[in-house]
């Protein structure tokens, strides 16, 4: 029986929902639930209340300690209930929805003849990835802390609701190491000890995120799409996307969103989107 209701993060206006509505098959309702906190419980409770409905969830991958090569298909998401593995749904192969929106193939299809020259766009993406490599390594290291109430995995000014990013001059390796130190010091005042040494983790991930590292090779999977997008703002201006009044990066994203909204075959644009559509149709509990 195919999925009737697909829960996802965000709200009804979020770009996650708008993209998913273009991917899911007919008959599947996309239902945003806000924060990811309690996502598992929401799905299980909904199934108990509506036993005749097929309910599943799709969540962001976020940062994790798995640097395996991309598989271009959603990962299966399970919960352990009464000592049994129960399928909840899936999580994206890439970090978050922006990682898909800024992919060159999506940009080309969403913007059509208004798309920037793809070679120049790819150069802008590569440049952005190089600039945020250290910061990404720090965010991944902070995200690998597993105790309750882990530290916030970013810093800087709030660029849009929920997204913080430092000034460009604060992206150096030494800056990231210093910020991690401040976060560790703050947490040590609140807890007896950290369960992992975040700075050691940072050193390890730093190599993976640097040029030639496995995560850098696949930065559209492992780096934060929101960070990559924001760091491209000056390059996007050169490609014709002007501040008005939002930064050029958000103007660019809005053009992509509109292109997706006006297209009927969005689910065919990426192999992972095609596979998600299939998995929704084939889902079994």
Which positions does each model-derived feature cover?
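Acidic, divalent-metal-binding catalytic cores of TOPRIM
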Residues: 1-285
